[in-house]
């Protein structure tokens, strides 16, 4: 379903040398394909969209190993960002999904609502299936928390709806 996006990411990753290039490559394709806007580096998370939080690392630093230092760092960061965002938005952490991406591999992470510990899924290589899983997680995250910030973004004077209302 997202074969073209996988092909674009696979072509681009050959040239990626920094975490920033991984982040820009992924976010550009996600936003253009799904017509959504990620919040980049808010609250120190690399990117978030509704209840999906993505943590990027430099190319290949997971080494396909859940015990690698950079994968453990990504887990630790997601285990801070997800509860923080859940607290701000007033939702349970189980509604949030973390995704760790190092340009060559992808892992999904949930936070246990019992003990707050990260529960990682397997580290998957970049493939049409793993890319589709990321796109579907983002596409299906359509529930926005009712917060002042979200209401201003959706209906304030800088939004499409707000602009249309002011011109009516």
Give names to the regions the model predicted:
Residues 1-97, 105-166:
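A short, conserved, highly charged catalytic patch centered on acidic carboxylates
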